[in-house]
């Protein structure tokens, strides 16, 4: 036992004095940290931040954005698209009816036209059209499952306007659909005037009186978009008191149009849409 104690004392002498646990260690500094060798996940310690190169990779598929609407305000003829169907064209003529005459026409039509709110059917659900309408023509006209009965009793003012449009455009018409938008809440939803009774590439002459409303158009999407209108071309045309707008060519085949509701107060507006209706679609110009 005594030999074991002696050997332990000898071994302890070689260890030297024990270090106190209270001895303070130097605090790590930013300089010390920078001198430490980083792990494999970081860069070489001698490479500066400014020397690093970041390589931007283009996405494999481009970001698709909806185009900004084209606004048409000035008088002129505009080809808005071209497709295998043909050229879609609109002609804008502000002030076609001068201000004094337009005021008189508006007052007479508000008073004399037999305006009526009709019931439409959409997705087998009936609804009240958010506007008043009237029909003039020797033939009936059916759209949105609504049939307008023949009405050959043209108001003299309407006949005068029809003749004036025909003389200035070279087009002839035999029918007229009248629309009265009573206020900002009245509207017409997206549609095309492409009923079979109108024939192929129908010409529509639209004459406006009263408050200015925005006429909007959107191009029909290609088949691969499966009816998605998100990225289609769009056109906006403000229609003022006395303005004439002609839609022709493939416009009804390739585009839709509407007059949307508005958030701000609007006075009444009358829109006259002259067109040609054929008695037998098989005899139309297809």
UniProtKB/Swiss-Prot annotation:
Pfam families attached to this UniProt entry: 2OG-FeII_Oxy_2
After translation, how is this protein modified?
A: Ubiquitinated; undergoes 'Lys-48'-linked polyubiquitination. OTUD4 promotes USP7 and USP9X-dependent deubiquitination of 'Lys-48'-polyubiquitinated ALKBH3 promoting the repair of alkylated DNA lesions.
Free-text comment on the cofactor: Binds 1 Fe(2+) ion per subunit.
Annotated residues for binding of substrate: 115, 141-143, 194
GO MF: broad specificity oxidative DNA demethylase activity; ferrous iron binding; mRNA N1-methyladenosine dioxygenase activity
- Residue positions annotated to bind Fe cation are 191, 193, 257
Residue spans of biased composition, Polar residues class: 20-36
Instruction: State the source organism's domain of life.
Output: Eukaryota
- Give compartment(s): Nucleus; Cytoplasm
Say if the entry is tagged with keyword Chloroplast. Answer: no
Please give the name of this protein. Answer: Alpha-ketoglutarate-dependent dioxygenase alkB homolog 3
Species: Bos taurus
């Amino acid at each position: 036992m005594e030999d074991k104690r002696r050997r332990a004392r000898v071994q302890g002498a070689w260890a030297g004095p024990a270090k106190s646990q209270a001895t303070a260690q130097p605090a790590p500094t930013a300089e010390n940290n920078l001198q430490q060798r980083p792990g494999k996940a970081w860069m070489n310690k001698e490479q500066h931040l400014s020397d690093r190169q970041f390589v931007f990779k283009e996405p494999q598929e481009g970001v698709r954005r909806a185009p900004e609407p084209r606004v048409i305000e000035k008088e002129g003829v505009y080809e808005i698209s071209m497709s295998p169907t043909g050229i879609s064209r609109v002609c804008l003529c502000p002030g076609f009816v001068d201000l004094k005459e337009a005021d008189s026409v508006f007052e007479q039509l508000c008073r004399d036209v037999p305006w009526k709110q009709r019931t439409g059917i959409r997705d087998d659900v009936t609804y009240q059209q958010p506007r008043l309408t009237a029909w003039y023509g020797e033939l009936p006209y059916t759209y949105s499952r609504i049939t307008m009965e023949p009405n050959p009793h043209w108001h003299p003012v309407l006949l005068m306007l029809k003749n004036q449009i025909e003389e200035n455009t070279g087009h002839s018409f035999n029918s007229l659909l009248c629309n009265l938008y009573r206020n900002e809440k009245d509207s017409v939803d997206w549609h095309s005037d492409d009923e079979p009774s109108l024939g192929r590439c129908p010409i529509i002459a639209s004459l406006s009186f009263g408050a200015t409303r925005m006429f909007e158009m959107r191009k029909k999407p290609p088949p691969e978009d499966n009816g998605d209108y998100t990225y289609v071309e769009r056109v906006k045309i403000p229609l003022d008191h006395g303005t004439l707008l002609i839609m022709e060519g493939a416009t009804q085949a390739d585009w839709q149009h509407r007059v949307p509701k508005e958030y701000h107060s609007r006075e009444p507006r009358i829109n006259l849409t002259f067109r040609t209706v054929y008695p037998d679609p098989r005899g139309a110009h297809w």
